[in-house]
Amino acid sequence: MNSEGGKPGNVLTVNGNYTGNNGLMTFNATLGGDNSPTDKMNVKGDTQGNTRVRVDNIGGVGAQTVNGIELIEVGGNSAGNFALTTGTVEAGAYVYTLAKGKGNDEKNWYLTSKWDGVTPADTPDPINNPPVVDPEGPSVYRPEAGSYISNIAAANSLFSHRLHDRLGEPQYTDSLHSQGSASSMWMRHVGGHERSRAGDGQLNTQANRYVLQLGGDLAQWSSNAQDRWHLGVMAGYANQHSNTQSNRVGYKSDGRISGYSAGLYATWYQNDANKTGAYVDSWALYNWFDNSVSSDNRSADDYDSRGVTASVEGGYTFEAGTFSGSEGTLNTWYVQPQAQITWMGVKDSDHTRKDGTRIETEGDGNVQTRLGVKTYLNSHHQRDDGKQREFQPYIEANWINNSKVYAVKMNGQTVGREGARNLGEVRTGVEAKVNNNLSLWGNVGVQLGDKGYSDTQGMLGVKYSW
């Protein structure tokens, strides 16, 4: 069927009957809409047996089909089975299957980017009930779209954090008053699991991540003997592995991202002595990542991403009351409203896959807004008098808004993540001052959105001051 130069448009005519014996037939086609140029096979008589079909895409960018691209026309009894060697063929954001037509076209075979309700086979084994084109069905998107979306979302959020994520309870550094400025080093580990959907619910993605961040204060000082300032540096390593499964095609896609960050942070506390009043925290990071997207029996795609993320956070701590416990604990209850704005400017490099698909991700420049309240109990037991030991369990609730949707354009067709524009979050954890030098903190939290979006994570941090 292949002509010199590989241009589609050849027609193979069989004047009699055709019997397939698991042979292979290759067609060239420019995959797009119904009227796309393609090689064709025209059987005047009957068909029977099984035939493997390979379709080479010649410059097609993918598009929605209605009836499909006619590949095989049958004039007589259409009892033969034709199946793609790979189960599907892809162009742009779309997945094409080989299916029989409907109505007056029920004898013919078409390449369709519409879902027919039948998952295509990964191998061209004989099929008793071949798929049928459904002109009213939804278009089918490639699972790779979910991997690109997961990677760009991770690149912008892996190192995003809050004041107490980074430093636990900064006011546990009490040696400032008695010994001058205190230096400190801190480290935190984060593990998380995210579930999301894309492409009108077709693509289901699960992702597991790990984050390591560490840093230290360069300076601490007070401007009026009551407030306190922190200035420090930080760096980190993170990775994430995602898996996207389509509920309409028979193959899946894997996304991987790993990279580093480095930057600065600065924090101001209004009233260090009473641990109340306002605070303002800010940080900025430069981030760089290596990314890959791979799928079953298809070429892997490697690319990089770079960019800056930055945040400003503020809050106000109220002392809500004090009380003594039955076992000799002195408890002080605090309430702390918080607000945070994070700018996420990490961008993937626009590029073209080996299969000719142009990849452009969206969502960089997202502004994430968080509004919430944290309430915690500072507890000190009598037996810890003189030991500088304190424990601070807490719970917080947040509303999170993202100004942009993370998405990917594949040859100009946009597929976006769903359900993550507005999120509700609950966290609970504990911050502990073990002694005058060592502090520990940890928490677990869950975020819930629309359309099945969820994110669960746990964190453990440690800080040593001297």
From Swiss-Prot:
GO cellular component labels: outer membrane
Superkingdom of source: Bacteria
The protein's name: Uncharacterized protein YdeU
Residues passing through the membrane, by range: none
Entries under Pfam families matching the protein: AC_1 (PF18883), Autotransporter (PF03797)
Autotransporter domain location: 178-466
NCBIfam families in UniProt: autotrans_barl (TIGR01414)
Alphabetized InterPro entries for the sequence: AC_1, Autotransporte_beta, Autotransporte_beta_dom_sf, Autotransporter_pectin_lyase_C, Bact_Autotransporter_VF, OM_autotransptr_brl_dom, Pectin_lyase_fold/virulence
Organism: Escherichia coli (strain K12)
